[in-house]
Amino acid sequence: MFYSKPIKIILYIGVIFCTSLSEYDMVLEEDSQMNRMVESMELFKMIGKNRWLSEKQLILFMNKTDILKKKISCSPLTSCFPEYDGPNTYEGAVQFIQKSFVELHNEEDKNVFVHLTCAVDKECMQLVFDLISDIIITFNQKECSML
């Protein structure tokens, strides 16, 4: 008797990637030569270039905004990004880091949705989840030719 398991096809509409804004001046525990932010950027680039995920939308959560706000005045962004010549402020740091991540996927057909988050802030996270839901609904409507 022949039994076969059903093949399940999973369709991914996007990839949610989380990075910590506060780790720009830290190194990995397992590799003291590797900056955590640089490693996060390399992983983000690899995921976006993966042949199975290359056409999928990328949703980037840049988390720990609260910690970055406190930390940036004491530890300059140039510790990770020597090329950074902007102001040593929260706004300047976020703008530069966000641009650096988005530029990793600058093809015209690749959208990177960036959301600044503070996971301990319930209102912020609810807003983020609502936005992600809207993205998913819009994608599904496009796939069904409703838009």
Please report, for each region that a protein language model flagged, where it lies by residue.
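Conserved GTP-binding G-domain of TRAFAC-class P-loop NTPases and closely related GTPase folds
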Residues: C18-L147
